[in-house]
Amino acid sequence: MNLHEYQAKALFAEYGLPVSEGFACDTPQEAVEAAGRIGGDMWVVKCQVHAGGRGKAGGVKVTGSKDEIRAFAEHWLGKNLVTYQTDEKGQPVAKILVESCTDIANELYLGAVVDRSTRRVVFMASTEGGVEIETVAEETPELIHKAIIDPLTGPQPYQARDLGFKLGLNPTQMKQFTKVFMGLAKMFEDHDFALLEINPLVITDEGNIHCLDGKIGIDGNALFRQEKIRDMHDPSQDDAREAHAAKFELNYVALDGNVGCMVNGAGLAMGTMDIVNLHGGKPANFLDVGGGATKERVAEAFKIILSDDNVKAVLVNIFGGIVRCDMIAEGIIGAVKEVGVTVPVVVRLEGTNADLGRDVLASSDLDIIAATSLTDAAEQVVKAAEGK
């Protein structure tokens, strides 16, 4: 689950971190009134969506005119913002953040993630603020400095000072940076974050550290104990198919290919996507139906996959462990009949009663291709998607 910028900054403020005064607004009139409450003669207005690249897409504006604030809000509220991080439809804009304008002397980067290789929370800092951290990691990795948080001792001030020295901060800024670092580390643990980014973390003209942006991702598995964070969820930013899949306990992630994938088990699903890619295809989705591949769940999975108009063929890859393959085959046949699948369907079954399952598929009067191996399945579905 992701948070909007205004929600992230509200959390920053709760932990005593320096953020701009701002208000999230639902209407153009509210946006104009917010500028009046903030005061001054320059403001920043930002579309609130769960995507980066807003500035390049016209979703951020610096202005000294309340009329321009009104026009910006009238233009964007209720519309979709398309950036390089969204699909072609973009993300709906329901709120506009109006903030005081900050004069910037220098831009830095500060972020934290759960690093699986070290099994620790790792903070990253860089002098290359305002740039995608992935770009920095690829082109100039030596400019990314890290601090690994030991879960037994927690974050330590010396780690913040070490990062601060590498960022070239002066003693006053070092103290401010240490406060930000310690506050973010506590916030990360308190609220079960999976990702945290401040890009850019700026040094103002007065020489002070300031959190100019905020990006937060929450571990969805921890939401049961994060009621406050859970209430911040904005369903309008979710992919409609992913949200529908979650209702049926299906793990679905939309992609941009033309081969629909239905698999039981996350590891097998990722392996299936890899082998489809290996044979020249492009997966249209990740979909894990879990351990209970029942007719009902398979039917819903087909409906979700086929709601994507780009899907030209479907690969069903099931390992029968607890559930027998012949029962799974009957479920697939029933689901195909119920949904009215019109694209080619390739099925690969392995495990308990796999041969019997393939016989069940072969004896049906449906156009279902029973593959003999995973390689065969990938080759068949890629050909089918290409119309061969």
Curated annotation (Swiss-Prot):
GO BP terms, alphabetized: succinyl-CoA metabolic process; tricarboxylic acid cycle
Top-level taxon of origin: Bacteria
InterPro entries: ATP-grasp, ATP-grasp_succ-CoA_synth-type, ATP_grasp_subdomain_1, Succ-CoA_synthase_bsu_CS, SUCC_ACL_C, Succ_CoA_ligase-like_bsu, Succinyl-CoA_synth-like
UniProt domain ATP-grasp: residue ranges: 9-244
Keyword Nucleotide-binding: yes
Cofactor note: Binds 1 Mg(2+) ion per subunit.
Name under which the protein is recorded: Succinate--CoA ligase [ADP-forming] subunit beta
Record organism: Shewanella sediminis (strain HAW-EB3)
Gene: sucC
